[in-house]
Amino acid sequence: MTIRLRNRVNFFFFIIALVILAVNTAVFLYNFIAGNIAVPSDVISKSSFPLLRYDFWSVIASVIAINIYVVAVSFILLRTFEKTQATEVFFFLVFLTSLIFDTSRIYIPVRGISESFSYTLIHIGNLTLAARLLAPISLFALTAFCEEEFRQQTEQNCIICILVAVFFAVFLPVNTAIIGPNLCISYGFGKMVHGFSMVLYIASVMTLFIRNKKDSFSQINTAGFLMIIIGYNILFSASSIAGFASGVMILSAGTVIYLVKLHQHYLWID
């Protein structure tokens, strides 16, 4: 894929992300004003401390923050890397795709969806599960398949990442009767999915660390990448003010550090 075509894909992705943000926000606000938002009342808070106590609106804020993050970062990628050959941009867009899938959680509190065993709820469960699978897969691919010898297969590798995540998200069962505090629908083989994700996250950080050491490139880049992983998982799981705030800060800081160092790397190469 040429740089010009990549930039077009990036621009198209940015527009889609912007539209999804507008639709998600508008639909939620409409249902909130209409009194159609079912705020969970049976969630048992694990802490009595105000910042750590369960807060439904922190969950909603986290989902919206993820959506805003996708729009902002896709625009930054478009403007910052438009003249570079950074293969990482493709895989980062796939990672952002997983976050787009994750924003479907915002529809779960809408009355008529959360209070029924509808196909809509099942599809939302499939999307959130796909997000949980695609995030680690895309980040691992970002570190493992960005070398020169894999550059010709970048598009195919990105498509494979998405297809694998979607296939298993549809294949694995979801339990719409159980919805977590973070509005995530329960799914089968949860421990296996978490273990798989953890292995890929660790492998991706180690791969990037080794590659940066080999290329004599700053490990600050690796630290930023690790912060992206930590921040994303905190923000996804956030059900308190502290979780929301820390997730936003760590994810944002990690993204800035990683992308700045990555841009410096390609400026040096080009």
Task: Put a short name on every predicted segment.
Residues 8-18, 144-172:
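The cytoplasmic-loop to transmembrane-helix boundary for the fourth helix
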Residues 68-93, 99-158:
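Internal transmembrane alpha-helix with an interfacial aromatic "cap," most often the third helix
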Residues 6-17, 26-29, 45-67:
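Hydrophobic transmembrane alpha-helical segments in integral membrane proteins
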Residues 91-98, 158-166, 218-229:
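Central hydrophobic cores of alpha-helical transmembrane segments
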Residues 58-67, 123-136, 187-201, 243-258:
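Alpha-helical transmembrane segments of polytopic membrane proteins
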Residues 71-76, 137-147, 169-179, 191-219, ...:
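Alpha-helical transmembrane segments in multipass membrane proteins, preferentially the mid-helix core
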Residues 108-118, 171-184, 231-242:
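Juxtamembrane "helix-exit" motif on the non-cytosolic side of transmembrane helices
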